[in-house]
């Protein structure tokens, strides 16, 4: 309401400070991975729901959970590194274990843990029937991603 929006999708990012939460970003759109997470976990089409709302229709609510889903962007080790190489065989194996994945860094790229999530080596979406299976699958993919990237101090 503070932005004048009364319908549609919004994406707001907060940081928690000693003084309390602070809004750092407000967007008139859904957040980066929300569409894929809802589609894979509930079979829900968020884009359709947004379109229905824009047309003045009440969108159907998401149905029950069909699968557990997580979007993961593993952070690199603490410090400044350069990507010396990427083992495409291992990275392909990692992404074959995920529902979807992409590398965010390539050989020669600088990786600096101080810059936050833009330092992520890759991003991927995993799903599973149970929470335990989801965590196991996420751990497997994450381990392979870290094996695939060769980092050297920058």
Predicted regions and their residues:
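Conserved protein kinase catalytic/activation segment
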Residues: 20-22
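Active-site "cap" helix and flanking loop/linker of ATP-utilizing ligase/carboxylase catalytic domains
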Residues: 1-12, 18, 27-82
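Peripheral (often C-terminal) accessory segments that flank ATP-dependent C-N-forming ligase machineries
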Residues: 51-154
């Amino acid at each position: 309401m503070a932005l004048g929006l009364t319908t549609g999708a919004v994406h707001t990012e907060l940081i928690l400070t000693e003084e309390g939460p602070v809004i750092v970003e407000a967007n008139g759109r859904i957040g980066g991975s929300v569409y894929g997470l809802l589609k894979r976990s509930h079979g829900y089409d968020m884009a359709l729901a947004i379109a229905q709302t824009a047309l003045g229709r009440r969108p159907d609510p998401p149905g029950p959970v069909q699968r557990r889903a997580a979007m993961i962007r593993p952070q690199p080790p603490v410090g400044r590194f350069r990507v010396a190489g990427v083992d495409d065989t291992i990275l392909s194996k990692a992404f074959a274990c995920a529902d979807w994945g992409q590398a965010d860094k390539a050989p020669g790229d600088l990786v600096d843990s101080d810059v936050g999530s833009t330092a992520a080596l890759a991003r991927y979406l995993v799903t599973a029937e149970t929470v335990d299976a989801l965590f196991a699958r996420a751990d497997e993919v994450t381990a392979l991603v870290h094996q695939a990237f060769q980092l050297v101090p920058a």
